[in-house]
């Protein structure tokens, strides 16, 4: 069995000990969120079972890991943090928001939309999850394809129970609004 212990989640990554049999090896990765700790643990276990030492595996995480659009930090000159995540399912959105909530000192503001010509049933669920885990939600358009962007937004908003959301169909304007509302620690 492989286990991740003494987990520390930070805005610039995660630190934890990997335990297997009588070994404990520290791992530091630039990936944030518990779901990435689990993903890292699975990768470690797979490599170890193929004969790679835990120490060698741990060293591979020393290099920065940036996966474009996956919990990717956007560095801007501001007293708050900005992340981009491709979360396109209810579970992915929830995982991203839970991870960000754990490292956010202030409010969690999310800008999101759902793509067109895709599963319509997930839209209200994603709206509900966003409203549940974020302090403020800005619903916007996200590649509507051949669908009416306003119809997609209506589907999303139908699942939202909180009043803490805005609808800004133009994505650039939605992002600008989020940035203008963010404060130190958000």
Segments from the language model and where they lie:
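C-terminal helical cap/extension that packs against the catalytic core
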Residues: 127-181
């Amino acid at each position: 069995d492989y286990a991740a212990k003494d987990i520390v989640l930070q805005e610039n990554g995660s630190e934890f000990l990997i335990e297997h049999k009588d070994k404990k090896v520290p791992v530091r990765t630039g990936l944030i969120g518990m779901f990435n700790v689990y993903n890292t643990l699975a990768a470690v276990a797979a490599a170890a079972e193929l004969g790679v030492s835990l120490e060698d595996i741990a060293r591979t995480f020393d290099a920065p890991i940036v996966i474009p659009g996956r919990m990717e930090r956007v560095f801007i000159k501001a007293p708050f943090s900005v992340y981009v995540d491709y979360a396109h399912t209810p579970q992915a959105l929830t995982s991203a928001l839970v991870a960000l909530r754990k490292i956010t000192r202030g409010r969690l503001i999310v800008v999101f939309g759902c793509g067109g010509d895709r599963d319509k049933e997930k839209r209200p669920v994603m709206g509900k999850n966003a409203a549940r885990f974020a302090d403020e939600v800005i619903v916007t358009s996200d590649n509507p394809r051949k669908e009416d962007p306003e119809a997609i937004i209506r589907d999303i908003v139908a699942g939202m129970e909180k009043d803490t959301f805005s609808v800004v169909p133009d994505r650039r304007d939605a992002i600008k609004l989020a940035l203008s509302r963010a404060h130190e620690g958000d």
